[in-house]
C-alpha cells in the first residue's frame, strides 16, 4: 500500500467505523475540514451580473444569491492540470456533450474523467461561465436561483469579497520529498481508498506525516511522497549542525531542475544550500562521505548584470570550484556539489534534473529582510579624507600593486577598503571612486585559496561580484579583488597588477548627528541629494500627493538600487504597513511613470507584481517583503507615504540602463529597422530549422555578441512598432495561423534574489507590461518571457525552450563582427562539392555551430575516407599539437541519445577512436576529430575547441520520401507484402540464426537479398512486425572500412541508428570483406526497439530479413496497401479508426467519443510504427490523445497513463498548452489545440478494459525506508547514490530484510535498467546477487536457485569468470551483465524483497455451537469492541494533533550516527510496466 500502513487491521477498522457512526462520531479528514476556512487558495466565485455565487448542486452548478463562505458547495480551488475543484461535491467543474443534444452541458464530474473538458483557462473562465450558464436562461430555475442569460453575459466574475479576478489564487506545484516518486509534484486532487483528497493528508499514516499521491489514483500506481512542511524546527527530514545551528536536507531520492529544487526548499521555509565557511564545507563533506551523487546547491549566476551568488543572499566569500571551473558560464548558470571530487563545485545547465540539498536556520522562517542601517553618528577626519557612517575614506590615485597599496594605507593609519552594505558601496561609487575605472579594495584570498576575507579583519557580510566572477581565471592565482564599473561590481585579479586604491579607517567621534541636516527641515532625513520625510497618516493616493505638495516636496521617486536601500532602511520598523511612492499607471495603459514624467530606469517589484490589471498606484511593502513594490488601488487603498525634496542636482539613473540616451538621428545597421520616433533599431531572428532556435540565455548571448540586447519594451508605442515589424515579416493573418510562434524578449525573473519579480536583461526598469492573462502561472518554473505572434502579448515560458528571438541595438551603433579571433584559413577551401573553413580560436560546440550559421554553413559532416583525409591534412597544418581536437557536426540529442549530423545528413561513415564513443547517457555529447589520427571521440559540448564549418548548395536534410509507385503483383506463400515489396523474417528457430554472409546467401537462395530500408515508411512496417520477435535481425547494411552501404550499392538515404550507434567497424584484415554489419534490434526497451546497431559480421549469429520485389503474376495481398480513412484497423489487440477531415483537437476528441472511442493512446514503438503507416497513407498529420497542461510543456495522455514512451521530433515538445499529433514522417509534434489538422486517430473501446493484475501485499513505507518501488510480486530499493563493495551490499540488503538484486526474466531486467540508466552519473552499475556454485558447476542466486535467464554483454562469460573470486553486476548504461572482481570494486546497490502480506481477519471460521462458548465469544467481542473504540478515540486525537503540524512523535534523523547504509535512497520513477501486463 505504498505510504499507507493502517493503524488497525482491515476488519476492525470497518467494524469500528460502524460503531463510531452509531455513537455520533465520524471518521473523516479533520485536517482537511478544520483548515478549510483558512486555506488561502480556496475562494468563492461571484457574478457581478447575477449578484450571486457559483454553487455545486449535485451534478449541476447554479448561481445562488446568498454567498456563504462556510458552505463547501460554494468553495472552489484551482488544482493541477488546470482544473477547478469544488470542496462540497469533491468533483471538478467540466463540460459534457450529450449525444442527443448539441448544447454543451456545464456540471460537476469525477476529476479522473478522460477528457480535456475539465481544464479551464482562468483568464477566460468568466466568459465561459457567462456563456454556458446563459444557455440555460430559458430553463426552469429552482427557487432561490437567478439564471438571467443577459445579465450573465454582460456580468463580470471575480473572487467574492475582493477585487481579485479568477486568476488571483493560482495553483502551485507542491514538490514531494522522499517517497518513491523522486520529488515529482503532487497530483491534486488524488484518489486514495476510493476517496478524493484536494490537498496533502495524513490519512492512513500512524506517524501523522502529511503525504500525497503523485498520480491521480494511488491505488492503481502506488506513487507517493511526503509533503513539504514549513516549521521552525529541524526534527523531521533534517540534519542539524550543532555548532552553527544550521539544518540540512539531502534529497538524494529526488531529481529536479534547479528552479524546481529551489521551489521545493522554499516550500519548507528553507533555501538551496549555501556554503560560506570552510567548517561548513567540511561538515557537508562528512555527510556526503560514502555517497556518489551530484546535487544542486544555491550557487547561481542567474543575475545577468551580476556575478555568482547564493540564492539565500549569503555573501559569496568562500569558493570550492573544481579545477577549470566554472566553465561555459554563458549557458551553465547553476552550481552543483559533487561527491566524486570530495565536495568540489561545478556549474551545470540549470534545466537538467538532479538531486539537491536544502538548508535552513531553525526559528528563522519569517524574519523580514534586514535592510542596510544608517549610523546616526558624526565623525571628524584628517584632511583629504571623507567621512561617512563613522569611518573616513581616501582615494589613492597612485597606481600600485595590491600589497603596496595596503602598506600605503597602513602608513596613513587605515587599511584597504572593506565594504559591508549597499549604502556604503553607493558612497564609494558616487563620492570616492568617481571617474576611476578600476581600483583595489581589501578583499583577498591570500591566506587560503578561494576563501575571501577583508584585509582589515572585519567580517565579510556583503559581496557584489561582476558577471561571471569570481572565477580565478584559468587558475591564474587571482587572489586580490578590484572594484570597477559604474555599479561598483567586484572582480578577482592578480595582486601584482598596478591600480589606484581606496583606504578606510575609523573616524574620530564628534558632537552632533551625522551629516548635520544639509538644509533639511526638522524631522526630515537627508540622503544625497535630497531630504526625505515619512508621512504617518494613512491616506488615499491623491491625498498623499497633496500632503507632500503642501510640504514643498513630491512623493518619493526611486531611481537606483542605492536609493532603494536607503528608503528600505527608513521604513524598516513599520512592519505590516505600506508607503505610497510617485509611481503610477496614469492612463491605465499598463505603462508606469513617475509623477515627474521621468522614465522608469529602475524597478523593485514584489512577486506577481505589477500583476495583469491596468492602472493603479505603487506602494512599498514592509515586513518580509521589505521595500518591494506593489500596485494598489489609487482611490480605495490607504497607506502612509514618503515625501522627497531634492536639494541638489537632478537624480542620475543607475546604470546599466540605456545610457547615454541613444540618438534619434543615428542610422541602423544593414538588416535592422526602426521608426523615426524610436532611439533603437530592431531585428527578428527566426528560422524554420529547430537547430537554429535558441534558449533564452543563448538568445541573449547572440544579441550581446552583436553588441545588442534582447528586446526590451518601455512603452506601448515601441511595442506597436515591433508588432508592425512582425506583421510585415509574417503577414497580418488570422491569429490562429500564428498560434504558438513565440519570440524571446529580455524580460525574465531568473535571479532568485529578486523575489520572483520581472526584470529586463538590459537593465531597463520594468515599467510597461503587456502580459496575456496567464492561467495557473507557475512562477517557480517559467522564468522568461516571450512575445506571442498571435496575440502580440507576452507569455511566461520555461527559459530552456528553443525559440526565435528579437534583438535591439541603439541607433548609430555598428553591429559587431563575430569575434572569431585569429583564423588559420581566411578563405573557404573547396573540396569536391562543398567548401570548408577552419577556425583556430576555441569555442564551445554550440557557439561554434552558431558561428558557422552566420556564414550560411554548419559544423562539418564527414561522409567518406577521402573527405576525412582532406580534413585531417588541413587540421595538421593548423595544429601546433598534432593531438589537437577539432569540433565536427556530430552530436547526440538529450531526448534520445542518438547521434546526428548538425546539417541533417545521414550517418554513413564513422571513424571512432578505440574506446569511443563512450556509453550513452543523459547528457548531450558532441564529437571531435583529432588532427593526426583523424579519429573521433565524444566529450562535453561545453569544452572550448577549434572547429570546422562546411557549406554546400545541396541540403543534407532528409524529407519524407514519396510513396513508391503502385505496382500490381503479390508475394509467394510465407512472404508478407507491403506496397511493392515482399518481406520474410527468418530465425524463429535458433538453429536458423546465422552470420551476416550466410544470411545473405540464404536470401539469394530464395531469389531475394537482405532487406534494404529506404525510408521511414518501410522502417515503420518492419518495426510493426516485431512484437513477437525475440532476437535481433540482420539487414543489408554493412561496412567494409569506415563507411556503410547497402548491398548492390544502393544509396544510403535513410538511417535509424540506436542511441550511441554506430560505434564503427572493426579494423578489416583486408579491404574487401565487410567487418561491421547492421542489425535491427528487438530490444524490449522502447529506446532501442526497431533501431539499428552495427555488429561483427563474422562473430555473431542472428535472424535476418529477406526482401524481394512483388511478382506481377500473383494477386496482391489485401494487407499490402496503406490504411484508408474511415476503416477500423486492428493491431496488437487494439482497434483504431482513422478520421480524415479538418478538425481541431477538441473536435477530434468529440468525434471519437461519439463513436465509443477516444483519441488514440500510443504506448509503445510497435503501435507508433503502425500509426506511422496510417499517417503516411493519408499524407496528413493526425491528432492523438496527448496534450499538455495550459502553460506547461509537460504532456500526458488523456487516459492518465504515464508517458513512458515518446517519439518526439527533435526539439519537441515545443508548445505550452498544446496538443500532439503524429506527423507524416511518424514523429510527434505539437501545435495549438485550436489548429485544424486534416485528420485524427481514434482508439476504439471494445468492452471493459482487460483486468489489471493485482498483487497482494505492500512495500515498506517508514520514514527511513520509504522509497521501495513495487513491481509485480516484489519491492525494490535503488541505492545508486551509494558505492559499496559486494560484501557491504549483501550486508545492507540483509539489514533491510531483503537480498541483493536478482533478475529472473527480460521484463524484470528492463525494469531495473530503466532505473539504473537514469542514474548512471552516480553509478556505472549495481551488484547482482549471484555467485558460482562449484558443486553444481553453475551460477546461482542468493537463495541457491539456478540462474536460468541471463543478459551477458560481449564478450560473454568466460570460464575464468566462474569462480569464487568473481562477482557480477548489471551495467547502468546498457542493462547488460558483466563479470568482475569482488574486491576493490564499488557499485550501486539494489535490494529486493517480496511484498509484505497484510494480516487480515479470516471470516470463514464458524461460530461455536456450544451456548457457553457462544457467550464467551460474544463477551470477548464486546470487550474487544470497547478496546477498539478507546484505541480509535486515542488515535483520532493523535491524528488531529499531528495534522495541526505536530511532529513530536516523529524521530527520523539522518544524523552522524546513521551513515550511508541508513540513508534515504535515491530513486528513479518506475515505469508502470506492471500495470500493462496481461494475464496469460
From Swiss-Prot:
Residues 40-166 form the Ricin B-type lectin domain. SUPFAM superfamilies: C-type lectin-like, Kringle-like, Ricin B-like lectins. It is found in: Cell membrane. N-glycosylated. This is C-type mannose receptor 2. May play a role as endocytotic lectin receptor displaying calcium-dependent lectin activity. Internalizes glycosylated ligands from the extracellular space for release in an endosomal compartment via clathrin-mediated endocytosis. May be involved in plasminogen activation system controlling the extracellular level of PLAUR/PLAU, and thus may regulate protease activity at the cell surface. May contribute to cellular uptake, remodeling and degradation of extracellular collagen matrices. The keyword Cell cycle does not apply.
Amino acid at each position: 500500500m505504498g505510504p499507507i500502513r493502517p493503524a488497525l487491521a482491515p476488519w476492525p477498522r470497518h467494524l469500528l467505523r460502524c460503531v463510531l457512526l452509531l455513537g455520533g462520531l465520524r471518521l473523516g479528514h479533520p485536517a482537511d475540514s478544520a483548515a478549510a476556512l483558512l486555506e488561502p487558495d480556496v475562494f468563492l466565485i461571484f457574478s457581478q451580473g447575477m449578484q450571486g455565487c457559483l454553487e455545486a448542486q449535485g451534478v449541476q452548478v447554479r448561481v445562488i444569491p446568498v454567498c456563504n463562505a462556510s458552505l463547501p458547495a460554494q468553495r472552489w480551488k484551482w488544482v493541477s492540470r488546470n482544473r477547478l475543484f469544488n470542496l462540497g461535491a469533491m468533483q471538478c467543474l467540466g463540460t459534457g456533450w450529450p449525444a442527443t443534444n448539441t448544447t454543451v452541458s456545464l456540471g460537476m464530474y469525477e476529476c479522473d474523467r478522460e477528457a480535456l473538458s475539465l481544464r479551464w483557462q482562468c483568464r477566460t473562465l468568466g466568459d465561459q461561465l457567462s456563456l454556458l450558464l446563459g444557455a440555460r436562461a430559458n430553463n426552469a430555475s429552482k427557487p432561490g436561483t437567478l439564471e438571467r442569460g443577459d445579465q450573465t453575459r454582460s456580468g463580470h466574475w471575480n473572487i467574492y469579497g475582493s477585487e481579485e479576478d479568477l486568476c488571483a489564487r493560482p495553483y502551485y506545484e507542491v514538490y514531494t520529498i522522499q517517497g518513491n516518486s523522486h520529488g515529482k509534484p503532487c497530483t491534486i486532487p488524488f484518489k486514495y481508498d476510493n476517496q478524493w483528497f484536494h490537498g496533502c493528508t495524513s490519512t492512513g499514516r500512524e506517524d501523522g506525516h502529511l503525504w500525497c499521491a503523485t498520480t491521480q489514483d494511488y491505488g492503481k500506481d502506488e506513487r507517493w511522497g511526503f509533503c513539504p512542511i514549513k516549521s521552525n524546527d529541524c526534527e523531521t527530514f533534517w540534519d542539524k549542525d550543532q555548532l552553527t545551528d544550521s539544518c540540512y536536507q539531502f534529497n538524494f531520492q529526488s531529481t529536479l531542475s534547479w528552479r524546481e529544487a529551489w521551489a521545493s526548499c522554499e516550500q519548507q521555509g528553507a533555501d538551496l544550500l549555501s556554503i560560506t565557511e570552510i567548517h561548513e564545507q567540511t561538515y557537508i563533506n562528512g555527510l556526503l562521505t560514502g555517497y556518489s551523487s551530484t546535487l544542486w546547491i544555491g550557487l547561481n549566476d542567474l543575475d545577468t548584470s551580476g556575478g555568482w551568488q547564493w540564492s539565500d543572499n549569503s555573501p559569496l566569500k568562500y569558493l570550492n570550484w573544481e579545477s577549470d571551473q566554472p566553465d561555459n558560464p554563458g549557458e551553465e548558470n547553476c552550481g552543483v556539489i559533487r561527491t566524486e571530487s570530495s565536495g568540489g563545485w561545478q556549474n551545470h545547465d540549470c534545466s537538467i534534473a538532479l538531486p539537491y540539498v536544502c538548508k535552513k536556520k531553525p526559528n528563522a522562517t519569517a524574519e523580514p529582510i534586514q535592510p542596510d542601517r544608517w549610523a546616526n553618528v558624526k565623525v571628524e577626519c584628517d584632511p583629504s579624507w571623507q567621512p561617512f557612517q563613522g569611518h573616513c575614506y581616501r582615494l589613492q590615485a597612485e597606481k600600485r600593486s595590491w600589497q603596496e597599496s595596503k602598506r600605503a594605507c597602513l602608513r596613513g593609519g587605515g587599511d584597504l577598503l572593506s565594504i559591508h552594505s549597499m549604502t556604503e558601496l553607493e558612497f564609494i561609487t558616487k563620492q570616492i571612486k568617481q571617474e576611476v575605472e578600476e581600483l583595489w579594495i581589501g578583499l583577498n584570498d591570500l591566506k587560503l585559496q578561494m576563501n575571501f576575507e577583508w584585509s582589515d579583519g572585519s567580517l565579510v557580510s556583503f559581496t557584489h561580484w561582476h558577471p561571471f566572477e569570481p572565477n580565478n581565471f584559468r587558475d591564474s592565482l587571482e587572489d586580490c579583488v578590484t572594484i570597477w564599473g559604474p555599479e561598483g561590481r567586484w572582480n578577482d585579479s592578480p595582486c601584482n597588477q598596478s591600480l589606484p586604491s581606496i583606504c578606510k579607517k575609523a573616524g574620530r567621534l564628534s558632537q552632533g548627528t551625522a551629516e548635520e541636516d544639509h538644509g533639511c527641515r526638522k524631522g526630515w532625513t537627508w540622503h544625497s541629494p535630497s531630504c526625505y520625510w515619512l508621512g504617518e497618516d494613512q491616506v488615499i493616493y491623491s491625498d498623499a500627493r497633496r500632503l507632500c505638495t503642501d510640504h514643498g516636496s513630491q512623493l518619493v521617486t526611486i531611481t537606483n538600487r542605492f536609493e532603494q536601500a536607503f528608503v528600505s532602511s527608513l521604513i524598516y520598523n513599520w512592519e505590516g504597513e505600506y508607503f505610497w511612492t510617485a509611481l503610477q499607471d496614469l492612463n491605465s495603459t499598463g505603462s508606469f511613470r513617475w509623477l515627474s514624467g521621468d522614465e522608469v530606469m529602475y524597478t523593485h517589484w514584489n512577486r506577481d507584481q505589477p500583476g495583469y490589471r491596468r492602472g493603479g498606484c505603487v506602494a512599498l511593502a514592509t515586513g518580509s517583503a521589505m521595500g518591494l513594490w506593489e500596485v494598489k488601488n489609487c482611490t480605495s487603498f490607504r497607506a502612509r507615504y514618503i515625501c522627497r525634496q531634492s536639494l541638489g542636482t537632478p537624480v542620475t539613473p543607475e546604470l546599466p540602463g540605456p545610457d547615454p540616451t541613444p540618438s534619434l538621428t543615428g542610422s541602423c545597421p544593414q538588416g535592422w529597422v526602426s521608426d523615426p520616433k524610436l532611439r533603437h533599431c530592431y531585428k527578428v531572428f527566426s528560422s524554420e530549422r529547430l537547430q537554429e532556435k535558441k534558449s533564452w540565455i543563448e538568445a541573449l548571448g547572440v544579441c550581446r555578441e552583436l553588441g545588442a540586447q534582447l528586446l526590451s519594451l518601455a512603452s506601448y508605442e515601441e511595442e506597436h512598432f515591433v508588432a508592425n515589424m512582425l506583421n510585415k515579416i509574417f503577414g497580418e493573418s488570422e491569429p490562429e495561423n500564428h498560434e504558438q510562434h513565440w519570440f524571446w524578449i529580455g524580460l525574465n525573473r531568473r535571479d532568485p534574489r529578486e523575489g520572483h519579480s520581472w526584470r529586463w536583461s538590459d537593465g531597463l526598469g520594468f515599467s510597461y507590461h503587456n502580459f496575456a492573462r496567464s492561467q495557473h502561472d507557475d512562477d517557480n518554473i517559467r522564468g522568461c518571457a516571450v512575445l506571442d505572434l498571435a496575440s502580440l502579448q507576452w507569455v511566461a515560458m520555461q527559459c530552456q525552450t528553443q525559440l526565435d528571438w528579437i534583438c535591439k541595438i541603439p541607433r548609430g551603433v555598428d553591429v559587431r563582427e563575430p569575434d572569431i579571433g585569429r583564423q588559420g584559413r581566411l578563405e573557404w577551401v573547396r573540396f569536391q562539392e562543398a567548401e570548408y573553413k577552419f577556425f583556430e580560436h576555441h569555442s564551445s560546440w554550440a557557439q561554434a555551430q552558431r558561428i558557422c550559421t552566420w556564414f550560411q554553413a554548419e559544423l562539418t559532416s564527414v561522409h567518406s575516407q577521402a573527405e576525412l583525409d582532406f580534413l585531417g591534412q588541413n587540421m595538421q597544418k593548423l595544429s601546433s599539437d598534432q593531438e589537437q581536437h577539432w569540433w565536427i557536426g556530430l552530436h547526440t540529442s538529450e531526448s534520445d541519445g542518438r547521434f546526428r549530423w548538425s546539417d541533417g545528413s545521414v550517418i554513413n561513415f564513422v571513424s571512432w577512436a578505440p574506446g569511443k564513443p563512450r556509453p550513452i547517457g543523459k547528457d548531450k555529447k558532441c564529437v571531435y576529430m583529432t588532427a593526426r589520427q583523424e579519429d573521433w571521440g565524444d566529450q562535453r559540448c561545453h569544452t572550448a575547441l577549434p572547429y570546422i564549418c562546411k557549406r554546400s548548395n545541396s541540403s543534407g536534410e532528409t524529407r519524407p520520401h514519396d510513396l513508391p509507385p503502385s505496382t500490381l503483383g503479390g508475394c509467394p506463400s510465407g512472404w508478407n507484402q507491403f506496397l511493392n515489396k515482399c518481406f520474410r523474417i527468418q530465425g524463429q528457430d535458433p538453429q536458423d540464426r546465422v552470420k551476416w554472409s550466410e544470411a545473405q546467401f540464404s536470401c539469394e537462395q530464395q531469389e531475394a537479398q537482405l532487406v534494404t530500408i529506404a525510408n521511414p515508411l518501410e522502417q515503420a512496417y518492419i518495426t510493426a512486425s516485431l512484437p513477437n520477435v525475440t532476437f535481433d535481425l540482420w539487414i543489408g547494411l554493412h561496412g567494409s572500412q569506415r563507411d556503410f552501404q547497402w548491398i548492390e550499392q544502393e544509396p544510403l538515404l535513410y538511417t535509424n541508428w540506436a542511441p550511441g550507434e554506430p560505434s564503427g567497424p572493426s579494423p578489416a584484415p583486408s579491404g574487401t570483406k565487410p567487418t561491421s554489419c547492421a542489425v535491427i534490434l528487438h530490444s524490449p526497451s522502447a529506446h532501442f526497439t526497431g533501431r539499428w546497431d552495427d555488429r561483427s559480421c563474422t562473430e555473431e549469429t542472428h535472424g535476418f530479413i529477406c526482401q524481394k520485389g512483388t511478382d506481377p503474376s500473383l494477386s496482391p495481398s489485401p494487407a499490402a496497401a496503406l490504411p484508408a480513412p474511415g476503416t477500423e484497423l486492428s493491431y496488437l489487440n487494439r482497434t483504431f479508426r482513422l478520421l480524415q477531415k479538418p478538425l481541431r483537437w477538441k473536435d477530434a476528441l468529440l468525434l471519437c467519443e461519439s463513436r465509443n472511442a477516444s483519441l488514440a493512446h500510443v504506448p509503445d514503438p510497435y503501435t507508433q510504427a503502425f500509426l506511422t503507416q496510417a499517417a503516411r497513407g493519408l499524407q496528413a498529420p493526425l491528432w492523438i490523445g496527448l496534450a499538455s497542461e495550459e502553460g506547461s510543456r509537460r504532456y500526458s495522455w488523456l487516459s492518465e497513463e504515464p508517458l513512458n514512451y515518446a517519439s518526439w521530433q527533435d526539439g519537441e515538445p515545443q508548445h505550452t498548452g498544446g496538443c500532439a499529433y503524429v506527423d507524416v514522417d511518424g514523429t510527434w509534434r505539437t501545435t495549438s489545440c485550436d489548429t485544424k489538422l486534416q485528420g485524427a486517430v481514434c482508439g476504439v473501446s471494445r468492452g471493459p478494459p482487460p483486468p489489471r493484475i493485482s498483487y497482494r501485499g505492500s512495500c515498506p513505507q517508514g520514514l527511513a525506508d520509504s522509497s521501495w518501488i513495487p513491481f509485480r510480486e516484489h519491492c525494490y530499493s535503488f541505492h545508486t547514490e551509494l558505492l559499496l563493495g559486494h560484501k557491504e551490499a549483501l550486508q545492507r540488503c540483509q539489514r533491510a530484510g531483503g537480498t541483493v538484486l536478482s533478475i529472473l526474466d527480460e521484463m524484470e531486467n528492463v525494469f531495473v535498467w530503466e532505473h539504473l540508466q537514469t542514474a548512471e552519473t552516480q553509478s556505472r552499475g549495481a551488484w547482482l546477487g549471484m555467485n558460482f556454485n562449484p558443486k553444481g558447476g553453475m551460477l546461482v542466486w542468493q537463495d541457491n536457485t539456478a540462474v536460468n535467464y541471463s543478459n551477458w554483454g560481449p564478450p560473454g562469460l568466460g570460464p575464468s569468470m566462474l569462480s569464487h573470486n568473481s562477482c557480477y553486476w548489471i551495467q547502468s548504461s546498457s542493462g547488460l551483465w558483466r563479470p568482475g572482481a569482488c574486491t576493490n570494486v564499488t557499485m550501486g546497490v539494489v535490494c529486493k524483497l517480496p511484498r509484505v502480506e497484510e494480516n487480515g481477519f479470516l471470516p470463514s471460521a464458524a461460530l461455536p455451537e456450544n451456548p457457553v462458548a457462544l457467550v464467551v465469544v460474544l463477551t470477548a467481542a464486546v470487550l474487544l469492541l470497547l478496546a477498539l473504540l478507546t484505541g480509535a478515540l486515542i488515535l483520532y486525537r493523535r491524528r488531529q494533533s499531528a495534522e495541526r503540524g505536530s511532529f513530536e512523535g516523529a524521530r527520523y534523523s539522518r544524523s552522524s550516527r546513521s551513515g550511508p547504509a541508513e540513508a534515504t535512497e535515491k530513486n528513479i520513477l518506475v515505469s508502470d510496466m506492471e500495470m500493462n501486463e496481461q494475464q496469460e
